[in-house]
């Protein structure tokens, strides 16, 4: 955790105490995430770290033996070598295939360099010292960042007067898709996107958690979000008699959709690097964020990067 980042965002809006502790639902059975002693107890009934380690090591050996001395060639082989068959098949395989729209045997091994495993009973998804969500939601943070700054929405940068931006500024901060900036001159990058189906449930507490991942193909969506758990805790959950839930669906990006995630396969990584080389020649343009750098970023590292550039 970066205290400078935490202090900066809290200077704009106060953050609450939310910590992400997702639950996985595999065919009606629940497992805590990330992989920790609670998960291993739910999976095998083991009570001690040594029992859990023995179970995973046994399954890892089977996976390594199947490779017969060669390196893992795809995500499935890599994951099996890291956590074994049970965790892979119930919590990784089908969820990953829904996320990426590809079989695990078709995804490159390097997507999963490592899978964090905790030998303690700890469901806190992140290890960061500072965690939370802006009180009132992220709109409060964005409004605070833009305070006193002229902001125009609904403007297509590439089909407006601002395309000739040097009339207005010495430098441009560009956060759109890097391939679009260069007119797709080297080809189009692939993206994944998500869509949501949101509804109101006539119950104060629908699933008891902010995030529940659905890790089997039997359910078409990847997860269900119950929004009130981001901001309401304890008895406050029941003070509001209804709740808003969203089903999240992962799909292939098509023109007109909003791109969310870069596709980290060999073709796209090579193409993205070629675009980054073009970007380096644009001395008056700062390419920042997921779309402009074609990299998956969490929020804190992006803010840290911005502070290093401008503060």
Predicted feature locations:
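N-terminal FAD cofactor-binding segment of flavoenzymes
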Residues: 1-31
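Conserved beta-strand segments of alpha/beta enzyme cores
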Residues: 14, 150-152, 284
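Mid-domain catalytic core of redox enzymes
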Residues: 158-278
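C-terminal catalytic lobe of FAD-dependent flavoproteins
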Residues: 258-311
